[in-house]
């Protein structure tokens, strides 16, 4: 009887270990934030963060899949356990850090204004004139802009969009005067559309991977994974492929 009991215990533990190994971590991504995260023309999640996390998952021995999530609701989805992490160009902010745990920063970005290629506007005029500035809703740069606008008394109006590329389209269609966003999607637009980066605003931002606060062991894997990735030649390949820097 004792042998049977021990056999069942071993079987149970083995099953638990197999279940843990089979777990697929769900990464919530912004479906329209090139070049860090987006869904390509074939419907496949792509981008710098997607490729980086795929490499880390393989190296650290876990499985991952990438699922587009509305950016405004991405942290609530993480807390509700509908996704397991956010590796999608998320800026580390004190407000977000109250709700989630962040990895060590893996990238820095600045914020920029984008205008039509033939626009005569200057940065000074953006702050001084009653223009319309398009920004992605739920982003740290949009919050910074709204807060500073109230403090400084800037005359422009902020119009919010579901994504930065949507703001670019309205810029080209003449519905807004300026788009404001992180540098990477602005540079992506500048390469593909008749627009130009006009100048910078706000503060330099740091990107990190967000997980639930109780998932510290998983967070350690992410941090170790990025440490290994940055020491591997593949890191420079990713930068060359996606960021062109």
What residue spans do the PLM features occupy?
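Bacterial N-terminal signal peptides
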Residues: 5-16
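Extracytoplasmic small-molecule ligand-binding "clamshell" domains
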Residues: 21-89, 98, 159-160, 234
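Short, well-ordered beta-strand segments
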Residues: 26-30, 132-135, 179, 210
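Periplasmic-binding protein-like
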Residues: 31, 108-117, 184-227, 244-245
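Ligand-binding cleft/hinge of the Venus flytrap
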Residues: 39, 53-61, 141-160, 190-191, ...
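Extended ligand-binding regions for polar small-molecule ligands
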Residues: 50-59, 117-132, 137-140, 209-245
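Acidic, polar ligand-binding/catalytic clefts
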Residues: 58, 63-127, 194-202
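Alpha-to-beta junction loops
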Residues: 62-63, 79-88, 130-132, 163, ...
């Amino acid at each position: 009887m004792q042998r049977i009991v021990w056999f069942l215990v071993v079987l149970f533990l083995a099953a638990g270990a197999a279940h843990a190994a089979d777990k697929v971590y769900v990464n919530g991504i912004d479906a329209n934030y090139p070049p860090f995260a987006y869904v390509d023309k074939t419907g496949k999640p792509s981008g710098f963060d997607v490729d980086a996390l795929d490499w880390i998952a393989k190296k650290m021995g876990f499985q991952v899949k990438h699922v587009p999530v509305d950016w405004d609701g991405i942290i609530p989805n993480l807390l509700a356990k509908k996704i397991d992490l956010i590796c999608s160009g998320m800026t580390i902010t004190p407000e977000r850090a109250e709700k989630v745990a962040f990895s060590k920063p893996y990238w820095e970005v600045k914020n920029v204004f984008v205008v039509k290629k033939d626009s005569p506007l200057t940065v000074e005029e953006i702050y001084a004139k009653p223009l319309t500035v398009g920004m992605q809703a739920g982003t740290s740069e949009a919050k910074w802009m709204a807060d500073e606008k109230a403090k400084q008394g800037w005359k422009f109006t902020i119009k919010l969009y579901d994504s930065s590329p949507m703001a670019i389209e309205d810029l080209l269609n003449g519905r807004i005067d300026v788009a404001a966003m992180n540098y990477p999607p602005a540079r992506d637009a500048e390469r593909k559309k008749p627009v130009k980066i006009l100048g910078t605003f706000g503060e330099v931002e740091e990107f990190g991977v967000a997980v639930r606060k109780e998932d510290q062991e998983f967070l350690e894997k992410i941090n170790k994974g990025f440490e290994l990735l940055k020491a591997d030649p593949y890191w420079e390949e990713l930068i060359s492929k996606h960021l062109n820097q």
